[in-house]
C-alpha cells in the first residue's frame, strides 16, 4: 500500500508541474499559449495511462483546456486534423472542387500538396475525363508526349480558343486542331486560350495540311487581328504580333521582315507534319523555335512585357494546324 | 383449418424478430446494429461473415471490436446505417455527380472534429455512401476559400506553428525529465 501511494504521488506532481509551466510561458508569449495547452493535453494523456487512479482525474483536467484553443482558432488535436486524412479520402473531397480551389488546396499544407502533386492520381484522371473531349483522349498520338493526366489537362487549358478565332476557322472536336475552311481571298488566324507573361513556356505546333502561299506560326497579343482580306502574312504585320512564315522562312514583326530563319544559307523548307516547338521566355523577353527537337536560334528578342498568346494564320483551304502546350521545355 | 393455422403462425413468428449484432468501440461503448443496416458497411459485413456470426448466435456472441473508432463517432455511423438500411449498397464509389439529400446534409453538418472523425470512421468501415456525402459536404465548405482560409477553417497548422509546437514539446519533455531527476 505504501508503495502504491508512492507511485500515485509522482504522476500528480508531474501533472502539477506540467500545469504550472504553461502559466509561466504564457506570461512571456501569449501567441504560444494555445499550443502549450495542446502539448500539455498530450502529456497528461501519456502520464495518465500507466496509473489506474489518474484516468478519473485526467478527463476533468482536459475539459477546461479544450475550450480556449477552439475560440482562438489555433491548431488543435493534430491526430484528427483535416491535413492528415487518408489519400483516398482527400481524392474524394478534391474531386468535387473546381480547379481554382484545387490550387488553394495545394497551398494549404504539405500533405494536401503531396496528394495533388501525384500527376496521375484519381483526381486528375477524373478531371481529365470530365474536361477533355473524347476525340482527344482516344487519339494515341495527339498528347503522347505528355506523360501525366495533369499535364494533359493543362494542355487543354492552353489549346486553341474556340471564341478567339477567325470566322473561317473552326476547332475540330479534339479541341487541339484548327481547320481552315476553303474561303477565297482570306487570311484566317487563331489564338490560344491562355496567354503567358512570366516564365518559360513551350508549345508544340504541327502543320497537318499543306502550307499554301502563307503559313505563319508565332505569337500575338490580345489585340492582334486574326482576319484580313487577301493572302497576307497577317501574323507579324503589326506591332501586336510576331510571326515566322514557314513558306519562305521569313521572320516578321511590325510589318518588317527580320530576315530568314534559321539564319543560314538556304534554310530547309518545312515538311508537312514536322513538329515545331515555339518557346517563349518571358523573363529574358525572347522567343525561338525548335524543329524536331533541334534548336534553330533566337527568332525574336526585346519582346515587350505583354501577355502573349500562341497563334497561327493560314490561307490554304482545308489545311489544319495542331497546337499542344508542353509547359517548361527541358533545357539541354 | 387447424393445420393451416399452425403453418401460418411459424411464418409470422419468423418475420417478426429483427437480428441485431453488437459492436464495441475503442472506448468500450457497445452498440447494436441490425442485420439489414450492417450491409451498408463492407468492413462490418465481412467481419460478420468471416468470424462466423449468424442470426442464430448473434445474441450470445461477444461484441465485434472496432479498434479505430470511438463511441461517439460509431454511434453516428450506426444511426446513419439504420436510416439507410433499405438503400442499395453501391459497388464502387459514386462519381462526381452525387447529390446530397436533405437528411444527410443535416446529418453531416456537425463540428469539424466530429466530422473529421466521421470521415475517418466511414472510410475505415467502408460505408461508401456516407463517406461520399461527407466528402461532398467538406468540398462544399472549402469551395471558394483561399489557402489561409482553408487552414483556419480546417484547423491545419502552418509550418511555423508546427515548428513552435515541436520546440515547445521538446522543452516540456526536458522539464519533465528534470523534475523526475529532482524527485528521484
From Swiss-Prot, chain A:
GO terms for cellular component: neuromuscular junction; neuron projection; presynapse; SCF ubiquitin ligase complex; synapse. GO terms for biological process: dauer larval development; determination of adult lifespan; negative regulation of apoptotic process; negative regulation of axon extension; negative regulation of axon regeneration; negative regulation of DNA damage response, signal transduction by p53 class mediator; negative regulation of gene expression; positive regulation of neuromuscular synaptic transmission. Component of a SCF (SKP1-CUL1-F-box protein) E3 ubiquitin ligase complex which is required for the restriction and/or maturation of synapses in GABAergic neuromuscular junction (NMJ) presynaptic neurons. Promotes NRJ synapse development and synaptic transmission by negatively regulating the daf-2/InsR pathway in muscles. By targeting convertase egl-3 for degradation, negatively modulates insulin-like protein ins-4 and ins-6 processing. May stabilize synapse formation by promoting the down-regulation of scd-2. Regulates axon termination in PLM and ALM neurons. Component of an SCF (SKP1-CUL1-F-box protein) E3 ubiquitin ligase complex composed of cul-1, fsn-1, rpm-1 and skr-1. Interacts (via SPRY domain) with scd-2 (via cytoplasmic domain). Interacts (via SPRY domain) with convertase egl-3 (via C-terminus). It holds the Pfam family F-box. Its main location: other. Residues 15-28, 49-64 have a biased composition (Polar residues). Residues 1-82 are annotated as: Disordered. Expressed in GABAergic neuromuscular junctions (NMJs). PROSITE patterns: B302_SPRY, FBOX. One of its GO terms (molecular function) is protease binding. This is F-box/SPRY domain-containing protein 1. Keywords: Synapse, Ubl conjugation pathway. Belongs to the FBXO45/Fsn family. Residues 138-330 form the B30.2/SPRY domain. Disruption phenotype: Synaptic defects that include both overdevelopment and underdevelopment of presynaptic and postsynaptic termini. Abnormal morphology of cholinergic and GABAergic neuromuscular junctions (NMJs) characterized by uneven distribution of presynaptic markers snb-1 and unc-17 and post-synaptic markers GABA receptor unc-49 and AChR unc-38. Also, formation of abnormally large and small synapses. Frequency of spontaneous miniature synaptic release (mPSC) from cholinergic and GABAergic NMJs is reduced. It is found in: Synapse. Residues 79-127 form the F-box domain. InterPro entries: B30.2/SPRY, B30.2/SPRY_sf, ConA-like_dom_sf, F-box-like_dom_sf, F-box_dom, FBXO45-Fsn/SPSB_families, SPRY_dom, SPRY_FBXO45. It comes from Caenorhabditis elegans.
Amino acid at each position: 500500500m505504501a508503495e502504491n501511494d508512492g507511485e500515485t504521488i509522482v504522476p500528480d506532481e508531474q501533472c502539477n508541474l506540467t500545469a504550472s509551466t504553461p502559466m509561466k510561458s504564457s506570461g512571456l508569449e501569449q501567441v504560444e499559449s494555445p499550443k502549450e495547452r495542446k502539448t500539455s493535453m498530450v502529456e497528461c494523456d501519456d502520464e495518465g495511462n500507466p496509473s489506474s487512479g489518474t484516468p478519473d482525474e485526467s478527463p476533468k483536467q482536459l475539459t477546461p483546456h479544450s475550450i480556449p484553443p477552439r475560440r482562438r482558432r489555433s491548431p488543435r488535436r493534430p491526430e484528427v486534423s483535416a491535413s492528415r486524412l487518408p489519400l483516398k479520402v482527400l481524392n474524394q473531397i478534391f474531386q468535387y472542387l473546381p480547379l481554382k480551389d484545387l490550387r488553394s488546396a495545394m497551398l494549404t499544407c504539405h500533405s494536401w500538396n503531396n496528394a495533388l502533386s501525384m500527376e496521375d492520381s484519381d483526381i486528375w484522371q477524373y478531371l481529365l475525363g470530365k474536361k477533355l473531349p473524347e476525340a482527344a483522349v482516344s487519339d494515341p498520338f495527339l498528347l503522347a508526349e505528355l506523360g501525366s493526366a495533369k499535364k494533359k489537362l493543362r494542355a487543354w487549358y492552353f489549346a486553341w480558343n474556340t471564341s478567339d478565332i477567325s470566322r473561317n476557322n473552326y476547332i475540330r472536336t479534339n479541341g487541339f486542331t484548327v481547320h481552315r475552311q476553303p474561303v477565297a481571298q482570306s487570311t484566317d488566324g487563331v489564338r490560344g486560350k491562355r496567354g503567358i507573361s512570366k516564365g518559360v513556356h513551350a508549345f508544340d505546333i504541327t502543320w497537318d495540311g499543306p502550307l499554301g502561299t502563307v503559313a505563319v506560326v508565332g505569337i500575338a497579343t490580345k489585340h492582334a487581328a486574326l482576319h484580313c482580306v487577301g493572302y497576307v502574312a497577317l501574323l507579324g504585320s503589326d506591332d501586336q504580333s510576331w510571326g515566322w512564315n514557314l513558306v519562305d522562312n521569313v521572320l516578321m514583326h511590325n510589318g518588317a521582315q527580320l530576315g530568314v530563319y534559321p539564319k543560314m544559307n538556304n534554310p530547309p523548307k518545312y515538311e508537312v507534319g514536322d513538329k515545331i516547338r515555339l518557346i517563349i521566355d518571358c523573363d529574358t523577353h525572347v522567343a525561338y523555335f525548335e524543329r524536331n527537337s533541334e534548336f534553330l536560334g533566337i527568332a525574336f528578342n526585346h519582346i515587350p512585357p505583354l501577355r502573349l498568346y500562341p497563334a497561327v494564320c493560314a490561307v490554304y483551304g482545308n489545311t489544319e494546324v495542331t497546337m499542344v502546350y508542353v509547359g517548361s521545355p527541358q533545357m539541354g | 383449418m387447424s393445420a393451416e393455422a399452425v403453418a401460418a403462425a411459424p411464418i409470422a413468428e419468423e418475420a417478426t424478430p429483427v437480428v441485431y449484432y453488437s459492436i464495441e468501440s475503442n472506448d468500450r461503448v457497445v452498440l447494436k446494429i441490425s442485420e439489414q443496416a450492417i450491409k451498408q458497411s463492407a468492413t462490418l459485413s465481412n467481419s460478420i461473415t468471416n468470424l462466423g456470426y449468424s442470426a442464430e448466435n448473434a445474441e450470445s456472441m461477444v461484441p465485434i471490436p472496432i479498434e479505430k473508432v470511438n463511441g461517439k463517432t460509431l454511434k453516428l455511423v450506426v444511426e446513419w446505417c439504420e436510416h439507410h438500411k433499405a438503400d442499395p449498397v453501391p459497388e464502387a464509389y459514386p462519381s462526381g455527380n452525387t447529390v446530397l439529400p436533405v437528411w444527410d446534409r443535416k446529418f453531416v453538418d456537425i463540428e469539424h472534429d466530429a466530422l473529421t472523425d466521421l470521415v475517418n470512421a466511414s472510410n475505415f468501415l467502408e460505408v461508401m455512401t456516407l463517406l461520399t456525402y461527407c466528402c461532398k459536404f467538406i468540398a462544399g465548405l472549402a469551395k471558394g476559400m483561399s489557402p489561409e482560409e482553408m487552414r483556419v477553417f480546417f484547423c491545419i497548422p502552418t509550418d511555423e506553428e508546427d515548428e513552435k509546437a515541436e520546440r515547445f514539446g521538446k522543452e516540456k519533455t526536458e522539464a519533465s525529465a528534470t523534475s523526475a531527476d529532482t524527485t528521484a
